[in-house]
Amino acid sequence: MRIMEDGTTTHAGVKDAPTKENVNGTLASIGATVFIPWSLMFIPKIFYFYLTPKMDMRPILFFMILVTKIADTGAFAAGSWTAKQPGGNHKLIPLVSPKKSWEGLIGGTVASVVTALICYFCWPASVSINGVKVFGIAEVIIIGILASVIGLLGDLAESALKRAAGAKDSGHLPGIGGILDTLDSLIFVSPLFYAYLNFAIANQAAQIMKFNQ
């Protein structure tokens, strides 16, 4: 059956061809439901990371999450404050995330490094496994810097997915939900931290094993 309307011929019961926006949204949702869960699965992998069942990874996992989320908080505070100053702040990638700024990145990095150093000196267990420090002070500073920078990349990646999907927040991405807005900074941090943790533990394996005997 054919229906003629305003000179346009369509087939009854046949849906319109998918638009570019719909295709982009579908691809973004697929990317979110595949790549992001794969990245975040490294969080439980760190928790269950062990050479023997006696290894307690909870403090070091909390350390990773803490310095990353503190970077988020510092970036938000610094970015919000500088945005209200005369002349505003300097945007990072306005097309992807209009509110992200260089001032926010600097503020987040300072907050992350300071938090990492506080953990190192005041809570040694957070950089240790069974009493053996796996991160030195220089490594802790580097981790603080990278947690801020790489965490920002995860945030930007999530923002790009949301824009491609035409969603204001990640709650509109099927299978992910608004929780992604909380975990976005860990998308790239968790797998990289896991990889570095493998390297650090390998260097300290002999000492760690002594404490497990």
Briefly describe each language-model feature range.
Residues 2-188, 211-213:
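Interhelical loop and helix-boundary elements at the membrane-water interface
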Residues 197-213:
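Juxtamembrane boundary at the C-terminal end of a transmembrane helix
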